[in-house]
UniProtKB/Swiss-Prot annotation:
Keywords per UniProt: Calvin cycle, Carbon dioxide fixation, Lyase, Magnesium, Metal-binding, Monooxygenase, Oxidoreductase
Protein source organism: Nitrosomonas eutropha (strain DSM 101675 / C91 / Nm57)
Protein name (database record): Ribulose bisphosphate carboxylase large chain
Residues reported to bind substrate: N116, T166, K170, R288, H320, S372
Catalytic residues in the record: K168 (proton acceptor), H287 (proton acceptor)
HAMAP family: RuBisCO_L_type1 (MF_01338)
Gene3D superfamilies: Ribulose bisphosphate carboxylase, large subunit, C-terminal domain, RuBisCO large subunit, N-terminal domain
Amino acid sequence: MAIKTYQAGVKEYRQTYWQPDYVPLDTDILACFKITPQSGVDREEAAAAVAAESSCGTWTTVWTDLLTDLDYYKGRAYRIEDVPGDDARFYAFVAYPIDLFEEGSVVNVFTSLVGNVFGFKAIRALRLEDVRFPIAYVKTCGGPPSGIQVERDKMNKYGRPLLGCTIKPKLGLSAKNYGRAVYECLRGSLDFTKDDENINSQPFMRWRDRFEFVQEATLKAEAETGERKGHYLNVTAPTPEEMYKRAEFAKEIGAPIIMHDYLAGGLCANAGLANWCRNNGMLLHVHRAMHAVLDRNPHHGIHFRVLTKILRLSGGDHLHTGTVVGKLEGDRASTLGWIDLLRESFVPEDRSRGIFFDQDWGSMPGAFAVASGGIHVWHMPALVAIFGDDSVLQFGGGTLGHPWGNAAGAHANRVALEACVQARNEGRQIEKEGREILTAAAQHSPELKIAMETWKEIKFEFDTVDKLDIAHK
């Protein structure tokens, strides 16, 4: 039997952490990094350094390596690939044994995978492109508190996307006027209205006042329309204790859904709130405020598809995903990829959509994809085609900006939505025939006709910053 001996000193990372013959186990957590190495650092050494610094390695040999089974616990860089059209960077694939991570803790996973390694001097830039969570790890996570089907049953809404609106202006309204805006939107045929992500409890509108006026508006709209309605009450707060206090009050007054800013509020807080919602029968809408700080730079940070997976694991029934056609970043292929990761039970590897690994979610429920940001009635055909039924189409300015007011804007969006869904169900190509479909519907809806006239020239035609690397070929 060979005796382990300790040899002090510094050695190349590749000697321990580069293992090209390794075959990943079904239980391994797999990561794909895009690495920009410093000048003079070769690919194998850079990949091995990332594997080491994101698992159990450090800059020098330590004698305590002899007290554990380093060969079992270490991360392994097992494959390197070229980035299409980019000679300065490469993809490194790293496998981590599942026992490196606390069960059900996306916080712990992120602490390793996107921790100190992102400040490592040997790496000029580093981006986490994708992560494969094995089913053995998925089953330790709570996931969405309710999921798509349970929410549809609670709200009694089937066969179409849900329709929402973010109340504007996002800041400055009093609680009473805010409630009035909510009522007008909901009675105009919307399913949901929403707090903006930065509405918490400011001097112009304290949270308790907002909750009370909004719930009064919601119940009044329900009574008048005969439909279930809801408003996403943002319970994001300075402390977890205050967050739960607000959530409890929302439950007491009968609100069906609350909201959380999962990145700004923190993954730990989000997982805790998701558990609370599951135990208390509440729906949880999740906003992605702060995501672009992490994901928009194509060379450094965390890709949004990873943030999508993290949200599904930690818990949320809705997640904002971009629109493709609106004012926010997101190309079509990438967006379709992370929408599937949010909703489907199994998503196969598909490099054309930026998906590097098969992802099996087992029986974990899916979450609604939320399209929000600079959208109006002219976008409806494309939104229905891109997002499908299991989505929330959320028009803020595209509702409240209607010349005849909030209720008319809401009604215009509902007519446009139902016209597009009906046309799709009849087998029509709604993106190609969108103008014809909307024009026909507008003949019976003056609200839609005015909305189409108001926003006919509004487009957001800017180049996408974070493009799929496949598109660089």
